[in-house]
């Protein structure tokens, strides 16, 4: 179950964007497995306001996690779309963070940053209690 999704430097978004499924504590429902989370959300806005780019960022993370990336295979490129309207951002890494509850009931945060050809860093943190446990971290 998705809690938060954050990304930066992807498609039409240069700055940090955050999407949260968390709801105010006064509105929590005890009838739901995760009472602090909304069971439904809507994404709406004017034409050309970034709705499709937001969904593309979420899809990119999903495919990156599912399919992975093999470095050093020919001229392989990571199919990310950095912000192109700023020459500095076009070459900067795109950053992503997903906070979620997994099927085991624990909360996890997975973060990574990629350029067109490399994974700059990757980190997975689990919350088996109130304290975070770093499961792995790798930097280039």
Q: Model segments located where?
A:
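Conserved P-loop NTP-binding catalytic core
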Residues: 36, 41-42, 55-116
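Generic, ordered loop/turn and secondary-structure boundary motif
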Residues: 11-14, 22, 84, 120, ...
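Glycine-rich loops and low-complexity Gly/Arg-rich segments
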Residues: 29-32, 42-47, 67-69, 122-125, ...
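Pre-Walker A-like glycine/lysine-rich segment at the N-terminus of P-loop NTPase domains
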Residues: 1-60
